[in-house]
Amino acid sequence: LENEAYFIKTNQKEVKIPLNFSICKVNDISSPKNTIIFVDEDKLQFPLTIRKRNEGDYFYPSGMKGKKKLSKYFKDEKMSLIEKENTWLLCSKNKIVWVIGKRADQQFVANKTTQNIIKLELL
């Protein structure tokens, strides 16, 4: 597994490498998709990190109960080895915020009471 990592600073508006996505503050939440998530800014610790998977990674997939090992999630999603190797993770400290293009971690997902919402969109 490669150890390359990229960082996102506070108030950064877009990311070009390794993936192209936009970051913006919004006032409300529309329907999330695989390519769009809405997160609670107050739960994030900057700089955020974009990295590949590590042994033992786990997250709390949105829409599911409890935590799941990333390896088990990949298996359940029937992802090929190439797909797994090409999947990037958006992390806050060491916690996965988003399996980019797949699923967000419910601990970070914005809800009706969230004050500061950030929309992340894969372009």
Q: What function would you assign to each model-found segment?
A:
Residues 1-123:
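AMP-forming adenylation/ATP pyrophosphatase catalytic core
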